[in-house]
């Protein structure tokens, strides 16, 4: 789980039941966790993606933190990604669909689930980019966003901070290589456990080469129908764009000299490290950052680049072998994972949370077969995160009744299947 803009995002695969202490949340969707109120059946959810390059590594060349401490402490810079605007989207069959505002035009999608009850339409990322993506700025130009944020006073402050020695506000966890043989001549890798970031901060390597993805429903999507990755750009010069590139969308900011650690060798009950991601709470880390007094510094802009990350889109199955997870297989004609039909009444006997549902499950309700594309997000992603109070208020029969009445012409009859 990570925290982005004050909201929690959990690994969709872990939510679906594939929880693992070694989950790196890479190549996967991070879905916004709902904690309050009763979610709408067709609710639009925010989501972000994390790629395989986003795992943090040790800040090898940085100054050592002063103070007595454990030998496992490393130094991870804190990055903030500021989006210029925000767009809403929905996950439909594992793919991102962008909500179209009034005034936009798009070809009507074939999938009826791309329509909302109020008449709004969704289109795929690819279709959106083809029609509405802004042109990338020419080489050597300064983007409007960076111009606005780069006043003379900010430039002076940034120059002063770059010339100052790096400051660390930690009374603990000095990196002692003599006490840590594993670090001799090598760079320790950060643990593979999931790492959260405090109050909208995003972690990265010290060189800022690996940055977590922009909010998956970014306002100006710049990836193909798979994923979005942030790569750093200069604040004053932008590389010559390729035909598939789009304009930079976000500014990347950081607290210079302030680091958090993804490793710690202290005992769980007696860790004094104020910048420890393992033993400090969100509130403590946020307080540590604020009390440092170090202002945010703009270190450049992030541009969306094309990377195949969505494991649902990157299917490598063949006619002879299917390597999809049993619950997520969408391969046509797959002999390993066949379509199964379950009666709606099964929920009353086993409960919603106990019924085994897959992408190929069809729920028989009122003489109709309801494919997973109509209920997957709600039953598999939203319901498991509901509180006991929310579950008590949930009328699953009424929910399915409304779904079938809305989409009846597009559902198969159970008697003819």
Swiss-Prot record:
Ranges of the Sequence repeats in the UniProt entry: 264-279, 322-337
Pfam families: Copper-fist
Gene Ontology molecular-function annotations: cis-regulatory region sequence-specific DNA binding; copper ion binding; DNA-binding transcription activator activity, RNA polymerase II-specific; DNA-binding transcription factor activity, RNA polymerase II-specific; RNA polymerase II cis-regulatory region sequence-specific DNA binding
Subcellular localization: Nucleus
Bias (Polar residues) ranges: 179-190, 228-238
Phosphoserine carried by residues: 143
Effect upon mutating residue 279 to Q: Gain of function
Record feature DNA-binding region, as residue ranges: 1-40
Entry superkingdom: Eukaryota
GO cellular component terms given for this protein: nucleus
Chain spans, region Disordered: 128-198, 216-242
One GO biological process term: positive regulation of protein catabolic process
Function: Regulatory protein involved in Cu/Fe utilization and stress resistance. Involved in basal level transcription of FRE1 and H(2)O(2)-induced transcription of CTT1. Regulates the transcription of CTR1 and CTR3 via the copper ion responsive elements in their promoters. Required for degradation of CTR1.
Further remark: Present with 14800 molecules/cell in log phase SD medium.
Annotated protein name in UniProt: Metal-binding activator 1
Upper taxonomic lineage: Eukaryota, Fungi, Dikarya, Ascomycota, Saccharomycotina
């Amino acid at each position: 789980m990570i925290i982005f803009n004050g909201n929690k995002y959990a690994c969709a695969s872990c939510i679906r039941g594939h929880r693992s202490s070694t989950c790196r949340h890479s190549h996967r969707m991070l879905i916004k966790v709902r904690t309050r109120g009763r979610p709408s059946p067709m609710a639009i959810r925010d989501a972000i993606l994390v790629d395989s390059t986003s795992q943090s590594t040790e800040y090898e060349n940085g100054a050592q933190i002063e103070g007595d401490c454990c030998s496992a402490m490393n130094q991870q810079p804190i990055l903030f990604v500021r989006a210029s605007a925000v767009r809403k989207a929905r996950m439909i069959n594992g793919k991102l669909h962008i909500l179209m505002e009034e005034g936009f035009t798009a070809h009507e999608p074939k999938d009826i689930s791309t329509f909302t009850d109020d008449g709004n339409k969704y289109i795929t990322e690819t279709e959106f980019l083809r029609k509405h993506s802004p042109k990338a700025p020419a080489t050597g130009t300064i983007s409007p966003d960076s111009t606005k944020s780069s006043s003379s006073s900010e430039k002076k402050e940034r120059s002063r901070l770059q010339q100052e020695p790096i400051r660390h506000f930690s009374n603990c966890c000095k990196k002692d290589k003599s006490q840590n043989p594993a670090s001799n001549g090598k760079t320790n890798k950060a643990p593979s456990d999931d790492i959260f970031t405090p109050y909208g901060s995003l972690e990265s390597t010290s060189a800022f080469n690996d940055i977590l993805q922009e909010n998956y429903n970014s306002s100006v999507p710049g990836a193909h129908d798979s994923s979005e990755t942030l790569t750093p750009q200069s604040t004053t010069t932008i590389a010559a764009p390729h035909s598939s590139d789009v304009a930079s969308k976000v500014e990347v900011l950081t607290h210079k000299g302030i680091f958090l650690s993804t490793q710690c060798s202290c005992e769980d009950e007696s860790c004094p490290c104020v910048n420890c991601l393992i033993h400090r709470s969100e509130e403590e880390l946020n307080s540590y950052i604020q009390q440092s007094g170090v202002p945010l510094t703009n270190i450049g802009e992030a541009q969306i680049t094309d990377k195949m990350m969505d494991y649902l889109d990157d299917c490598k199955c063949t006619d002879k072998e299917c390597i999809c997870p049993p619950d997520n297989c969408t391969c046509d004609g797959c002999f390993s994972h066949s379509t199964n039909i379950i009666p709606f009444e099964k929920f009353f006997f086993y409960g919603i949370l106990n019924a085994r549902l897959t992408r190929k499950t069809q729920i028989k309700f009122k003489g109709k077969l309801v494919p997973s594309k109509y209920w997957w997000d709600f039953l598999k992603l939203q319901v498991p995160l509901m509180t006991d109070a929310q579950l008590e208020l949930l009328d699953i029969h009424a929910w399915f009744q409304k779904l079938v009445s809305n989409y009846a012409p597009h559902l198969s009859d159970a008697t003819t299947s």
